[in-house]
């Protein structure tokens, strides 16, 4: 498969965005980002189970590490501290450390919430994005904007926290409902 790699160069950091059909966690990515890590795989409940199983198996194949999964169903109303606290509570109970990694598989809201949780847990841990919606693939996953809503307005609380990698598999778009 031909994949397009785009390097996002920022003042203090950089990361790759890999785009294509069937983009996955290949050996190079696994050895660089996953091997030996404590990983929390956060996915949207709307992602097809088959897709989650493929990604989970791919992560499990890469050697010793701790892998846990958390499924969330979020919307604009639940893009708040309560949802971030669910992630923080999970990380704390499972004793995740500064070297841990969050892998987020979902749309823009889940990317914002899980990115904000990563930015604020232990003053910042790494996270990787696998956006599953068109808007998340072209907007929410690029630029490091993370955050949540407040009762007084949208996206009022947040942080810039860059992902270590963005994997955009365009086949996710097939699973979206049609209007």
Predicted ranges, named:
Residues 84-90, 107, 119-120, 138:
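Hydrophobic, well-ordered secondary-structure scaffolds
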Residues 18-21, 81-83, 108, 135, ...:
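A short linear-motif detector with a strong N-terminal bias
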Residues 1-101:
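ATP/NTP phosphate-donor binding region
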Residues 45-47, 107-110, 171-172:
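Short glycine-rich anion-binding loops that position phosphate/pyrophosphate groups of nucleotides
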Residues 9, 24, 115-116, 121-179:
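A glycine/threonine-rich phosphate-anchoring loop and its flanking beta-alpha core
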Residues 100-119:
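Glycine/serine-rich anion-binding loops at beta->alpha junctions
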Residues 50-54, 112-113, 137:
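Phosphate- and divalent-cation-binding pockets in alpha/beta enzyme and binding domains
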